[in-house]
């Protein structure tokens, strides 16, 4: 049964990856689904999440979870990836289209995705159309979603199930980490530079030729001061801001910066609450309340006795 479960989980991951590769091609290769192929751990000891190696621009991300939950309880982890809906990004082929968003959620040990039969009707609607995948077998409490259309989803809701009560259950506060990205990255997970970049000159010299390539990009030929020629390969969809005969310096931009997206990460805490502690607290509070009531009644009785004695 366990082998069968793993087989279908791996099959689901393969089908989803194949779908993304076919329909999003290189434009999607900086999302968590691809980062997991190159990074065994989603988060370094320093706190840096793997997605930040591909998305070089920093953008905000918001995470909302309950302060505390009971064991074996389903709750929502809501991730907001805000961005300007009017902007368009450059695809791997150079065309312009709307931004996609994706997220990675790193939960404390023991927390996992809630099964479908535990979801409320409201939660089913919020998660409709979203496919959640585990990062890998060594990180069973880390899950990913995306890329999905940012126009369709203004937030990403993860249905989370807290660990069941047991002898080894730790009723403590634990950290929850999240990473969220919008748009394409500047570096592919394999280290290659994407066309969603500002391209700059690698040396001093004069732009001697600018020519188009078959894939929609450009080749900028720079004649250096010592007479050699350097060819700068510019990705498709770039806007050239230099012209032939222009003097350029090393690190001088040759194109505009097309990137409109970015990556952000955040963290918060969630506590696993012991029901027995809560029951004990309620009983203690009830005892204090009753004690206060009896003290007030006793005081009233004492005042009546004093008043009666004064009348005699």
Swiss-Prot record:
Its cofactor is heme. One of its GO terms (biological process) is photosynthesis. One of its GO terms (molecular function) is electron transfer activity. It comes from the Eukaryota. InterPro entries: Cyt-f_TM, Cyt_f, Cyt_f_lg_dom, Cyt_f_lg_dom_sf, Rudment_hybrid_motif. The keyword Zinc-finger does not apply. One of its GO terms (cellular component) is chloroplast thylakoid membrane. Coiled coil: none annotated. The chain crosses the membrane at residues 278-298. Binds 1 heme group covalently. Heme binds at residues 31, 51, 54-55. Keywords: Chloroplast, Electron transport, Heme, Iron, Membrane, Metal-binding, Photosynthesis, Plastid, Signal, Thylakoid, Transmembrane, Transmembrane helix, Transport. Residues 1-30 form the signal peptide. It is a single-pass membrane protein. The keyword Metal-binding applies. SUPFAM superfamilies: Cytochrome f subunit of the cytochrome b6f complex, transmembrane anchor (SSF103431), Cytochrome f, large domain (SSF49441), Rudiment single hybrid motif (SSF51246). It is found in: Plastid, Chloroplast thylakoid membrane. The 4 large subunits of the cytochrome b6-f complex are cytochrome b6, subunit IV (17 kDa polypeptide, petD), cytochrome f and the Rieske protein, while the 4 small subunits are PetG, PetL, PetM and PetN. The complex functions as a dimer. Component of the cytochrome b6-f complex, which mediates electron transfer between photosystem II (PSII) and photosystem I (PSI), cyclic electron flow around PSI, and state transitions. Belongs to the cytochrome f family. This is Cytochrome f. It comes from Bigelowiella natans (Pedinomonas minutissima).
């Amino acid at each position: 049964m366990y082998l069968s479960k793993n087989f279908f989980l791996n099959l689901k991951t393969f089908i989803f990856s194949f779908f993304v590769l076919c329909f999003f091609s290189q434009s999607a290769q900086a999302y968590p689904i691809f980062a997991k192929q190159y990074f065994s751990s989603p988060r370094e000891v320093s706190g840096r999440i793997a997605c930040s190696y591909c998305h070089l621009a920093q953008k905000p991300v918001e995470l909302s979870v309950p302060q505390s939950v009971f064991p074996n309880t389903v709750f929502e982890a809501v991730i907001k990836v805000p961005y300007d809906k009017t902007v368009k990004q450059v695809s791997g082929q150079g065309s312009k289209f709307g931004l996609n968003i994706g997220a990675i959620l790193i939960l404390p040990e023991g927390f996992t995705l809630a099964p479908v039969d535990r979801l409320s009707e409201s939660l089913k609607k919020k998660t409709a159309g979203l496919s959640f995948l585990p990062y890998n077998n060594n990180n069973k409490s880390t899950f990913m979603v995306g890329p999905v259309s940012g126009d369709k989803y203004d937030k990403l809701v993860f249905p989370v199930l807290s660990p069941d009560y047991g002898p080894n259950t730790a009723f403590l506060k634990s950290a929850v980490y999240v990473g969220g990205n919008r748009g394409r990255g500047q570096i592919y997970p394999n280290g290659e530079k994407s066309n969603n970049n500002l391209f700059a000159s690698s040396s001093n010299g004069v732009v001697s030729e600018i020519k188009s390539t078959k894939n929609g990009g450009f080749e900028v030929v720079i004649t250096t001061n010592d007479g050699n020629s350097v060819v700068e390969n510019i990705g498709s969809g770039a806007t050239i801001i230099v012209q032939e005969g222009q003097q350029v310096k090393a690190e001088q931009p040759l194109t505009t910066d097309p990137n409109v997206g970015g990556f952000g990460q955040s963290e918060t805490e969630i506590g696993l609450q012991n029901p027995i502690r809560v029951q004990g607290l309620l009983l203690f509070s009830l005892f204090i309340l009753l004690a206060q009531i009896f003290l007030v009644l006793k005081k009233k009785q004492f005042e009546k006795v004093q008043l009666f004695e004064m009348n005699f």
